[in-house]
């Protein structure tokens, strides 16, 4: 018999633009910020009893190497006795970290965990593989910021290696999502994020990041990526990434960003023992695979699998946080799931097109934003879902308590 698992606290850093304020911060230092904030916000917890820190991270080719979860928890001042593990399901890594913690607590192996994710895409390194033979030449330098690297020739032969924007155009073609609809979706994301920022919505979930400098410290408190003054006319002027006949542009796609998030998960026993306040229970998580060339449709089978498992319908959810990797795939997923393009339930405070998409952080950001929206609106259930590179989808459901 599985046990109830509660989310008791949830915070994140601001999301930085590519090359923006947070580009000065290493990924391990960035991940330490929300971890340290959770410790400070919950002084009654005996943190030596923390069973595990689960962090998602998609890159791990640079300063986020060698188990960034362990590095970050030590930098945050958690006891040396607390273990940490880094998970990688590409852009869904942060959500998978939450789901992994949920399952460990639900089955009775753990009582108290922190889960979240981090990504510093600004600091993603260039890498070069070793030669296959002595004195080999022609080695290729790979940019690890996003997408394929060190491709297996068999993968290329059997499945293709379409870049992420091409997979989004594939979805647009296969599911007949127009450029006009994609731009309208992107505009809604920007406008909603702008309204949320103006109303101070994100202040409830953001912990600031201090940037040390020779001329003094700078405090980063707000998301840097939103462009609330964007217009349809401006979006329409952008050239498609994959050629004039295609529809995906920089304006209707998510950003390349930096950020970190973390949540406290606990059993009922741990809640009572440590004086925690349960804010939501995790209902479940489900994953699914799809063709890599249309990876953006991955949320559809993942959500359907989760709904079957929970015996719920899509309209049972008061908020749906759908990661906006691209407007084309976001719209295709909503339509396949029977949700209106402009539903007020979906990303009511904007999504990744406006806020940005730091890969390993985003899944955790979706869950904690869904939690804060449920608390603000008085809603009951929240659904977070996202597509994953190489053809997967992930979905996680929560219920406010």
From Swiss-Prot:
Molecular function GO labels: 3-oxoadipyl-CoA thiolase activity; acetyl-CoA C-acyltransferase activity
Highest taxon above the source species: Bacteria
PROSITE patterns: THIOLASE_1, THIOLASE_2, THIOLASE_3
Keyword Acyltransferase applies: yes
Pathway: Aromatic compound metabolism; beta-ketoadipate pathway; acetyl-CoA and succinyl-CoA from 3-oxoadipate: step 2/2
SUPFAM superfamilies to which the protein is assigned, alphabetical: Thiolase-like
NCBIfam families for this protein: AcCoA-C-Actrans, pcaF, PRK09050.1
Function comment: Catalyzes thiolytic cleavage of beta-ketoadipyl-CoA to succinyl-CoA and acetyl-CoA.
Record PANTHER family: ACETYL-COA ACETYLTRANSFERASE, CYTOSOLIC (PTHR18919:SF107), ACETYL-COA C-ACYLTRANSFERASE (PTHR18919)
Name recorded for this polypeptide: Beta-ketoadipyl-CoA thiolase
Protein species of origin: Pseudomonas aeruginosa (strain ATCC 15692 / DSM 22644 / CIP 104116 / JCM 14847 / LMG 12228 / 1C / PRS 101 / PAO1)
Name of the gene: pcaF
